[in-house]
């Protein structure tokens, strides 16, 4: 097989595998969240459908596919229909620059478990993940529903504000590595736990994690779908599979940021003691994902004014201080 043919086949297989695996994990994420919340609230959670209730995911999928796809009478039809697609597709496109595993060989060809190893990986990731806000924005505006409009406005407010914190928190890491490639950042941390950026840049780790909660619409930092105030926010007027696509995008974003935090701050897929790198990245990402679920059960929502104060008066100045201190140390 020629190199060009192998490259084309490899790229197609990677795209299909990433799409199918992440979509499956997003479904499992809904099950995991329900079981974790149930455990923390001393409930059983899903248990009737399949062993330990694991087939509840299939039952929910059948329900979403068979429910009527309604639309408000005053909604903009075209924009209303494409908004969930934008939210879900942006979450999956952002994964194209993420190295999920260490490279390995097949039939003498080196396979790198990344769809596109561009030298601006972090910039691409932040740009595409930031585009997800358009799906939420136009979905709420096009639904002709007051809860949807308010939810979309609050979504834009929080996402645009914390996009700045998201980017600034990564600048010290980029300055120390000298590259925007996620693979280069992982290789910079291959000298044990002391080389992890969690140790070198702990403040940036906290800031980026806070911004990740905002990007994924996770409690306690979510203004988009606060049930006690906005019903379901921008998704109030949606039903069926289009409603489900918003949540597929949300859980896909959670998986993406769990992996990205593991790659940038927790050593990525570098092996640790006797644990191989492929298992290490899975364990680290699973811990971050569980942390996102745990905070929903443990912490209440912040008010919009509290969230904006956290962004502009606390996170932003701290991020700038980290940049200046890192620059001073490097120079």
Swiss-Prot record:
Catalyzed chemical reaction(s): a quinone + NADH + 5 H(+)(in) = a quinol + NAD(+) + 4 H(+)(out)
Membrane topology type: Multi-pass membrane protein
GO molecular function, one term: quinone binding
Job description of the protein: NDH-1 shuttles electrons from NADH, via FMN and iron-sulfur (Fe-S) centers, to quinones in the respiratory chain. The immediate electron acceptor for the enzyme in this species is believed to be ubiquinone. Couples the redox reaction to proton translocation (for every two electrons transferred, four hydrogen ions are translocated across the cytoplasmic membrane), and thus conserves the redox energy in a proton gradient. This subunit may bind ubiquinone.
Encoding gene per record: nuoH
Similarity-based family: Belongs to the complex I subunit 1 family.
InterPro entries for the chain: NADH_UbQ_OxRdtase_su1/FPO, NADH_UbQ_OxRdtase_su1_CS
GO CC terms of this entry: plasma membrane
Name the record gives this protein: NADH-quinone oxidoreductase subunit H
Subcellular location: Cell inner membrane
Keyword Transmembrane helix listed: yes
Transmembrane segments: 6-26, 45-65, 78-98, 120-140, 167-187, 193-213, 241-261, 263-283, 311-331
Subunit-level organization: NDH-1 is composed of 14 different subunits. Subunits NuoA, H, J, K, L, M, N constitute the membrane sector of the complex.
């Amino acid at each position: 097989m020629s190199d060009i043919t192998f490259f084309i086949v490899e790229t197609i297989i990677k795209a299909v595998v990433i799409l199918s695996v992440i979509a499956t994990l997003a479904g499992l994420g809904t099950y995991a969240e329900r079981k974790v919340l149930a455990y923390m609230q001393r409930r059983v959670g899903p248990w009737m459908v399949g062993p330990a209730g694991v087939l509840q995911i299939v039952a929910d999928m059948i329900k979403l596919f068979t429910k009527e796809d309604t639309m408000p009478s005053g909604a903009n039809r075209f924009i209303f229909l494409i908004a969930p697609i934008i939210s879900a597709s942006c979450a999956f496109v952002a994964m194209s620059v993420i190295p999920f595993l260490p490279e390995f060989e097949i039939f003498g060809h080196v396979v790198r478990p990344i769809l596109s190893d561009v030298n601006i990986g972090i910039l691409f990731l932040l740009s595409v993940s930031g585009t997800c806000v358009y799906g939420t924005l136009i979905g709420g505006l096009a639904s002709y529903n007051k809860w949807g409009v308010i939810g979309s406005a609050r979504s834009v407010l929080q996402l645009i504000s914390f996009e700045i914190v998201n980017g600034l928190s990564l600048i010290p890491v980029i300055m120390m590595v000298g590259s925007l490639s996620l693979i280069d950042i992982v290789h910079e941390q291959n000298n044990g736990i002391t080389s992890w950026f969690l140790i070198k840049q702990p403040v940036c780790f906290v800031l980026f994690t806070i911004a990740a909660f905002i990007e994924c619409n996770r409690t306690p930092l979510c203004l988009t779908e606060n049930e006690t105030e906005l019903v379901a926010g921008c998704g109030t007027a949606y039903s069926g599979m289009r409603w489900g696509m918003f949540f597929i995008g949300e859980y896909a974003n959670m998986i993406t940021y769990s992996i990205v935090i593991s790659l940038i701050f927790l050593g990525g897929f570098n092996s640790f003691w006797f644990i191989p790198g492929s298992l290490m990245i899975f364990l680290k990402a699973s811990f971050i994902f569980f942390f996102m679920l745990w905070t929903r059960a443990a912490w209440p929502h912040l008010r919009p004014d509290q969230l904006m104060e956290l962004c502009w008066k606390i996170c932003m100045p701290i991020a700038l201080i980290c940049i200046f201190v890192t620059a001073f140390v490097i120079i």
